[in-house]
Amino acid sequence: MLLPPYSPPQRSFGFGKLLLLLVLISGSAGAGWWATTNWLMPEQAAEPPLEEAVEPGSDESPRFSEAEQARKAELQARREELGIPYQFYINLANATFYERYPDQRDRTLTDGAEDEEWRSRWDAIAAEWLDLLEANLSPESRRQLGSYDEGDREQWKQQANQLYVGSRSLYDLADAEFFRLFPQAKDFIDQPIGQVWQGIVFDRLKALQDGSMLEQVQFDTGTYDKQLEGQLEPGEGRVYTANLSEGQILRLSLDAPADATQLSVYLPRPTSDLPALLEDSTDTTWSGNLPQSGFYEVVVVSTASEPIDYQLELTVDNVTSSPVEPEEPEAPEAKN
């Protein structure tokens, strides 16, 4: 892990809130240092500032020990196998290196023996990132790191909306995993690590689309109560959608280990005055009259450090009859 072990953040998640967080990994790869353009990977086209500089693993690298050449060659091969874009990998490792060793920010590492220890530390950071990205992002997600942007996020939002799921639910799922990995993360969206968050969003959208993290609640004929259950790994979550009517009374009861979950209830059409009925709450119960007709989203995410089992009871009643679903729910585009 690049950062301390997970402890549940006492904050509200959601992409809008992410933009307000403070800096996680300061610095950039703009200044760079000699190692990242010369002795790490053969793909970089920049001219080396030292005449002795050659590619890793080459017989013409007399200033690197055989062990160092082998280490760098292994990093290169592993990065390529994982499909992680070169420049993103450099930027990500650089940002972490500068964060850990800020005294190195204004100097250029050389290929000499005096910087052997610093090169070793950079390589160790790069290896940590390869481990983390392999374990927590899909191959498809990894291949796009460094290229995610606002246009992608807008497209993901539209795709989630087609499932009657809003961006808040999607980002809740991503935040749960991201903050498990980086509990101190702040103001990261424009930093290299922000690409990791967006990669997680991409994977969570796929999980919604394949149904592994999404379930539409259907009431059996003549009933108004639904018992749901499941197991969540650390950083996992699940979205439940239910097509309900304005004026109905919704009651939720979540049975899970203490302080191990966050619960949200999102509206069919969120507004600035009423964006949610419940958001990122450690509460395990909620009840109230529904203000709108359409698809409501109930999101359960795990903040635990080990797998948990949970049961969710969803009860809807009406003064005259059992729940009546609207014949024509709102268009998916009503979500945001």
List each language-model region with its residue ranges.
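Low-complexity, Pro/Ser/Thr/Gly/Ala-rich intrinsically disordered linkers and tails that serve as
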Residues: 1-8
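Membrane-anchoring helices that localize proteins to membranes
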Residues: 8-47
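Long, low-complexity, Ser/Thr/Pro-rich intrinsically disordered stretches
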Residues: 35-221, 334-336
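Extracellular, modular beta-sheet/disulfide-rich ectodomains of secreted and cell-surface proteins
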Residues: 214-225, 315-321
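Acidic, Ser/Thr/Pro-rich low-complexity intrinsically disordered segments
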Residues: 233-273, 277-294, 301-303
